[in-house]
Amino acid sequence: FHLALTFGLEDDPVAGLERMAGFVESLGAAAGIVEPLQMTVGVTDGEHLWAARYASGPVVNTLYHSADVESLRQLYPENERFAHFGADSRVVVSEPLTPLPGVWHEIPAGAAIVVTKGTVDQVPFSPR
C-alpha cells in the first residue's frame, strides 16, 4: 500500500498500482525471481473503489464483483442480506463464500475495475 502511494495511488489509483507492480517486477527480475508478484488489491477514497487482479506468472488469485443490487434482489428475493445493501452497492471479494449463480462476476487476470455509484468499469491492468 505504501509503495503504491509512492507511485501516485492518490492521483491516479490504477496507474499508481501499475507503477508499483512494475517496480516490484523490475526488482524481482534483477534478483533473478521469475514470478515475483501475485496480487489482488482493492483501495477506496470513500466514493470510488478500485480493484485489480494481477500475477507475474500463470497462476493468479481470484477476484470477483457482485451484480447490481436490483438484480440480486430479483434473483434471490428470500435472501435477507441483499435487503441491507444500498441501491448503488457492489461487493468485491477474493472468493465468494456462497455459490449463488448470477451474483458473482470474475474479474479477469490483468484487469482492474473502477466501481462508482453502482457502476463497474473494467480497464486493462499492466505493470509499467
Where are these regions (language model features)?
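Conserved short alpha-helical segments that host acidic/polar catalytic motifs at enzyme active sites
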Residues: 1-128
